[in-house]
Amino acid sequence: MSPKDLTPFLTTLWLLLGHSRVPRVRAEECCEFINVNHPPERCYDFKMCNRFTVALRCPDGEVCYSPEKTAEIRGIVTTMTHSLTRQVVHNKLTSCNYNPLYLEADGRIRCGKVNDKAQYLLGAAGSVPYRWINLEYDKITRIVGLDQYLESVKKHKRLDVCRAKMGYMLQ
């Protein structure tokens, strides 16, 4: 027999032996299913048990929710985005390096991108905190563009008049 004749036999044997030694990964087990009409409140963590099941960790215990449609998974998880801490989001997918996560329609999670819809991002700020500052113009040094400065000098013909008219302190 030539090696060419043995190739299909060896390939089949290798596939059979190799396949039996590969560990099989099963979907993570969830708690017993509880039929709820609405997602529980104040939940602080979640896990996807398989493509169609989500388990919510709440103060009262772990509640499993198995939606009939995969689109409902997004709605269940996004209702608790306000209570997810940064560390919980990071532990879901550590390769994202504390960046927001994006929740796919079927429940899978990936690192968020700039063009993702904000309503399905986990760990993103809903608003940027800010504080109003009272501006006191006499204490602020304004930066003037060179073109604007030269126009004012040309118009007033004197540097000291230019400064007084424009109200700028040039450094």
Curated annotation (Swiss-Prot):
One of its GO terms (biological process) is symbiont entry into host cell. Transmembrane segments: none annotated. Its main location: virion. One of its GO terms (cellular component) is membrane. It comes from the Viruses. Keywords: Host-virus interaction, Membrane, Viral attachment to host cell, Viral attachment to host entry receptor, Virion, Virus entry into host cell. It is found in: Virion membrane. Belongs to the HHV-5 UL128 protein family. Plays a role in viral entry into host cells. Forms a pentameric complex at the surface of the viral envelope together with gH, gL, UL130 and UL131. This complex is required for entry in epithelial, endothelial and myeloid host cells. Mechanistically, engages host receptor(s) including neurophilin 2/NRP2 to mediate infection. Additionally, monomeric UL128 may interfere with certain inflammatory cytokines to increase infection and dissemination by blocking monocytes migration. Forms the envelope pentamer complex (PC) composed of gH, gL, UL128, UL130, and UL131A. The pentamer interacts with host NRP2. This is Uncharacterized protein UL128. The lineage of its organism: Viruses, Duplodnaviria, Heunggongvirae, Peploviricota, Herviviricetes.
